[in-house]
Regions:
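N-terminal secretory signal peptides that target proteins for export/translocation
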Residues: 1-3
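FAD-dinucleotide binding site
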Residues: 5-11, 21-276
Length: 276
């Protein structure tokens, strides 16, 4: 298969964007194409530069690697994975510092790497009304339980048990392509006004490519960290601005003894606590 692309493409792909994750997750499996890029063969003789070594960039690089296409990855930081990070020092199990939820059935993990089957070899924890919630002093009536069962069936939720999203991406994508990553190379300008694309980094160094894949996060695009010449089309700009991106953070705390339930989801208006 020959690839005919414009000189620049922006991949708006994320493992876990906060907005609309339920709406997206519940339908993503059904909307997943029968064949994905990893299933196909590509031919391209030019050089491709991928901007960003997050999940999208690593997945794109894996496709190019498998098809022997000349490519390079420019990563702004000193690590790969983007918002996928893990901590192995705080506890005796890895802690996801970035994305951690799988808003879908386990088979989606196979589809992402081009494998058949509805179940994955990854060890996962399913979330259901029986395994997830308990309440202080309140028993579920049958109708409430049925409603919540239906909710979890429509919005399936899983988490990795003894690994993380970072491990999944590292094992299936990064280990094949990390030798092509230039770390600490933040791109500040992309000029695609001629046949060749010129990328300039913050230290003034220029990199030349025939095609460019921009895989930075939506937050970076919204902040206009990268200057494009010519400017992005109104269609692309509107698409970027329409994606809602809310701030958030994670706080992991370690105690000498357990004095609390497994976790607290929220406090309701009447003071009841939900645990998961």
């Amino acid at each position: 298969m020959k690839v005919r692309l414009k000189s620049i493409a922006i991949l708006l792909v994320s493992i876990s964007v906060f907005t609309g994750c339920f709406k997206w997750g519940s339908r993503a499996y059904d909307r997943f194409p029968e064949t994905i890029a990893l299933d196909k063969n590509y031919f391209y003789e030019g050089k491709v530069i991928i901007v960003g070594a997050g999940a999208s960039g690593l997945a794109a690089a894996r496709i190019l690697e498998r098809n022997n296409i000349n490519y390079e990855i420019l990563e702004a930081t000193d690590r790969y994975g983007g918002r996928l990070q893990k901590d192995t020092l705080l506890a005796d199990f890895p802690i996801d510092l970035g994305a951690e939820w799988i808003h879908n059935q386990p088979g989606i993990l196979n589809k992402l790497i081009g494998l058949p089957g509805d179940w994955t070899s990854e060890e996962l924890l399913p979330y259901s009304i029986d395994s997830v919630f308990s309440w202080d002093g309140i028993d579920y009536v049958q109708t409430e339980k049925e409603e919540l069962d239906a909710f979890f069936n429509f919005f399936p939720e899983y988490k990795f048990k003894s690994s993380t999203w970072f491990d999944y991406v590292d094992d299936n994508f990064a280990r094949h392509v990390k030798h092509k990553i230039r770390f600490n190379t933040p791109v500040s300008e992309i000029d695609y006004s001629s046949n060749k694309v010129i990328l300039k980094t913050k230290d003034g160094v220029e990199h030349v490519a025939d095609k460019v894949l921009v895989t930075v996060s939506i937050g970076v695009l919204k902040a206009n960290v990268i200057k494009f010449n010519p400017e992005l089309s109104n269609k692309k700009t509107r698409a970027i601005n329409r994606v809602e991106f809310l701030p958030g953070f994670k706080l992991a705390m370690k105690f000498s003894e357990k004095f609390y339930p497994d976790a607290i989801i929220f406090d309701s208006d009447i003071g009841d606590h939900g645990y998961y």
